[in-house]
């Protein structure tokens, strides 16, 4: 590309010029870009906000699941402790009754040995039945608690799946400014049906021509 059309800002000098080479420089010869350009701070977009919301929802779901697991473990521990305490109480009661029987008179033992044995057997049987009944009640309560926790966890999971993803949430479509205009779409015409026929005799033009000039 030629530069003949450009003006000469720095004309050529002959050999008679005694000035030192490079002592005079034009403004255009000086460096113009003396500062570095830095990147601007990133502008937050809808994608960033959506990502942040999803991360927060995920963290909330994890916390809820951890809380449910902790409650379930605590309930199991309480049931085990109560069963252990109950069994200890039953054992202590049996030992105390046996001790009372041993402290009774020797004469009574000899005369009523058969009756006391039968009574102790009956009491042991009743205690055993009572213990089994209490264990069944504890097991039923534990099963109900586990079922309740499972239902709550499933409900929380369904809500997270339904409302955690912003893309699946119902979106309210903004109405246009001319939605409620009184004379809206007046110039809009109904589409006419295509009456084209690939036959000159049965075409609309031929029929109009015959009706106008022949009949």
Swiss-Prot record:
Keywords: Coiled coil, mRNA processing, mRNA splicing, Nucleus, Spliceosome
Region: Disordered, residue numbers: 1-34, 72-125
A GO CC term attached to the entry: post-mRNA release spliceosomal complex
InterPro entries linked: Cwf_Cwc_15
Ion transport in keyword set: no
One MF term in the entry's GO annotations: RNA binding
Record's subunit section: Associated with the spliceosome.
Lineage: Eukaryota, Fungi, Dikarya, Ascomycota, Saccharomycotina
Composition-biased stretches (Basic and acidic residues): 81-97
Protein name, as recorded: Pre-mRNA-splicing factor CWC15
Family: Belongs to the CWC15 family.
Acidic residues composition bias: residue spans: 98-125
Compartments, as annotated in UniProt: Nucleus
Organism: Yarrowia lipolytica (strain CLIB 122 / E 150) (Yeast)
Top-level taxon in the UniProt lineage: Eukaryota
Listed GO biological process terms: mRNA cis splicing, via spliceosome; mRNA splicing, via spliceosome
Bias (Polar residues): 15-32
Coiled-coil residue windows: 60-162
Entry function: Involved in pre-mRNA splicing.
């Amino acid at each position: 590309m030629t530069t003949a059309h450009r003006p000469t800002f720095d004309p050529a000098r002959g050999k008679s010029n005694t000035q030192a080479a490079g002592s005079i420089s034009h403004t255009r010869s000086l460096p113009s870009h003396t500062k570095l350009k830095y990147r601007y701070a990133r502008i937050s977009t809808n994608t960033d906000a959506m990502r942040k919301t999803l991360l927060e929802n995920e963290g909330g779901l994890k916390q809820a699941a951890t809380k449910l697991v902790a409650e379930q473990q605590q309930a199991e521990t309480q049931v085990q402790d109560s069963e252990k305490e109950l069994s200890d109480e039953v054992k202590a009661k049996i030992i105390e009754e046996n001790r009372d029987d041993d402290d009774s008179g020797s004469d009574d033992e000899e005369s009523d040995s058969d009756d006391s044995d039968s009574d102790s057997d009956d009491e042991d049987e009743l205690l055993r039945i009572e213990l089994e009944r209490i264990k069944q009640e504890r097991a039923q309560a534990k099963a109900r608690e586990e079922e309740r926790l499972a239902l709550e966890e499933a409900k929380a999971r369904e809500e997270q799946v339904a409302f955690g993803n912003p893309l699946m949430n119902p979106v309210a479509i903004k109405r246009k400014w001319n939605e409620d205009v009184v004379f809206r779409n007046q110039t809009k015409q109904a589409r006419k049906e295509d009456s084209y026929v690939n036959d000159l005799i049965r075409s609309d033009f031929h029929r109009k021509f015959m009706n106008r000039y022949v009949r």
